């Protein structure tokens, strides 16, 4: 009994999954409840941030009144350079 208490919950969950597979029962992935909540929160936060980013870019686009072809080209190039820099730093 003491040995099982020393095993981290991740290993014990993997062990349980292997046992279930070998016995032919339906496998169920066991995760730590706080980890599941954390991942749900992360996904919600990231999707909200992505939506906000899209809304901001659309507002910027709509705020341009009678844009000339040159001003649009400059604007797009600036955005592309900024995006490229972020891509390389990450």
Swiss-Prot record:
Main location: host cell
GO biological process, one term: symbiont-mediated perturbation of host apoptosis
Region of interest called Disordered, as start-end residue ranges on this chain: 1-33
Alphabetically ordered keywords of this record: Apoptosis, Host cytoplasm, Host membrane, Host mitochondrion, Host mitochondrion inner membrane, Host nucleus, Host-virus interaction, Inhibition of host innate immune response by virus, Inhibition of host MAVS by virus, Inhibition of host RLR pathway by virus, Membrane, Modulation of host cell apoptosis by virus, Viral immunoevasion
Localization of this protein: Host mitochondrion inner membrane; Host nucleus; Host cytoplasm, Host cytosol
Keyword GTP-binding: no
Residue span of region Mitochondrial targeting sequence: 65-87
GO annotations of cellular component type: host cell cytosol; host cell mitochondrial inner membrane; host cell nucleus; membrane
Sites annotated Low pathogenicity: 66
Top-level lineage group: Viruses
Bias (Basic and acidic residues) ranges: 17-33
Functional note: Plays an important role in promoting lung pathology in both primary viral infection and secondary bacterial infection. Promotes alteration of mitochondrial morphology, dissipation of mitochondrial membrane potential, and cell death. Alternatively, inhibits the production of interferon in the infected cell at the level of host mitochondrial antiviral signaling MAVS. Its level of expression differs greatly depending on which cell type is infected, in a manner that is independent of the levels of expression of other viral proteins. Monocytic cells are more affected than epithelial cells.
Family to which the UniProt record says this protein belongs: Belongs to the influenza viruses PB1-F2 family.
Subunit structure: Oligomer. Interacts with human SLC25A6/ANT3 and VDAC1. Interacts with host MAVS.
Miscellaneous comment text of the record: Is not encoded in all strains, and seems to be dispensable for replication.
Protein's recorded name: Protein PB1-F2
Organism: Influenza A virus (strain A/Turkey/Ireland/1378/1983 H5N8)
């Amino acid at each position: 009994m003491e040995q099982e208490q020393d095993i981290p919950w991740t290993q014990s969950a993997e062990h349980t999954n292997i046992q279930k597979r070998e016995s032919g029962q339906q496998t169920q992935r066991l995760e730590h409840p706080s980890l599941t909540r954390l991942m749900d929160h992360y996904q919600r936060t990231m999707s909200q941030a992505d939506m906000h980013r899209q809304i901001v870019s659309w507002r910027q686009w709509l705020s341009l009144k009678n844009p000339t072809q040159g001003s649009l080209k400059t604007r797009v190039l600036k955005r592309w350079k900024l995006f490229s820099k972020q891509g390389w730093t990450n």
